[in-house]
Amino acid sequence: MSQSSVSAIRWANNQLILLDQRKLPLQEAYVNCVTHVEVADAIRQMVVRGAPAIGIAAAYGVALAAAEFGSDRDRLHRALETLADSRPTAVNLFWALRRMRGLIDGASVADLFPLLVEEATRIHEEDLQANLTMGELGADLIAESGRGALLTHCNTGSLATGGYGTALGVIRSAYRRDLVTEVFADETRPWLQGARLTAWELCQDDIPVKLIADSAAAHVMKTCAVKWVIVGADRITAHGDVANKIGTYGLAVLARHHGVKFMVAAPSSTIDFELFSGADIPIEERTSDELKFVQGTPLAPEKADAFNPVFDVTPAELIDAIVTERGVVLRPNAEKMLKLQ
């Protein structure tokens, strides 16, 4: 099974090459990173986004730091801190940096660069394989409900991961098994990841997609025979609470009201077993300009303030299934989540 026709992260000629997701779908442009600071800036400015992709990019950023600083552990540790500060919510970032730090602290060789490139590449490849596994496990759940429409939020495909996708990987696998009549993609304000990225990915793979306004989700669930809402995750607690793109919580509430199943697909690296309550997940807030402007064009009065949290937390009791490469947890709770540790 191929990963998809989309690739957002490449390592070539000792550079990290990122598809600039801010410019999609109108332009396919790339950003070449040759320093760890450039990688951190790319993460912060959302050139690359999606929890797994952020972790992968950060791992390559550590390798670039070794190209800059050699075996100077102090400077490498500061580079790790710079990368860790780029986005606060996605736990995959910190998971990947812990792996890279363990290699830095444990290696005895003078030249760390090839070792760190190898580890970053391994993280990248492991994510792709995890996504392929999740795709099949999630499609098995969809098969139990029968063929029908799916609804997804934000972007969880190859653009957000090492390839194939988490929630979008499930959708890809289900479509290949003729389980999907159509996909409804929320536009996902304010960055419009659904409109710009998910719709673009699905069109690239010739999967039928209908873009909807975020506010149309309830009507679509009520009238369009949606079988599953399928989303990704930026952090999952030990009890099964899920932090994901703002609007996910509302979709879970709507799905429960309309009798629609709600699935979260994410690699096990997204689970933070040291965090027990979703209330303790740090929620990133971004500038009000992201709400008040689109590509430099004002949408709101200049004097109007804006509140722009970019994640919310869906409690475990609203989730029907969490799908990881290690297995599936139905109706998650603390005891069931332990099987994924």
From Swiss-Prot:
Pathway: Amino-acid biosynthesis; L-methionine biosynthesis via salvage pathway; L-methionine from S-methyl-5-thio-alpha-D-ribose 1-phosphate: step 1/6. The keyword Amino-acid biosynthesis applies. One of its GO terms (molecular function) is S-methyl-5-thioribose-1-phosphate isomerase activity. InterPro entries: IF-2B-related, IF-M1Pi, IF_2B-like_C, Initiation_fac_2B_a/b/d, M1Pi_N, NagB/RpiA_transferase-like. It holds the Pfam family IF-2B. The keyword Amino-acid biosynthesis applies. It catalyses: 5-(methylsulfanyl)-alpha-D-ribose 1-phosphate = 5-(methylsulfanyl)-D-ribulose 1-phosphate. The record marks C154 as: Transition state stabilizer. Belongs to the eIF-2B alpha/beta/delta subunits family. MtnA subfamily. Catalyzes the interconversion of methylthioribose-1-phosphate (MTR-1-P) into methylthioribulose-1-phosphate (MTRu-1-P). This is Methylthioribose-1-phosphate isomerase. It comes from Hahella chejuensis (strain KCTC 2396). The lineage of its organism: Bacteria, Pseudomonadati, Pseudomonadota, Gammaproteobacteria, Oceanospirillales.
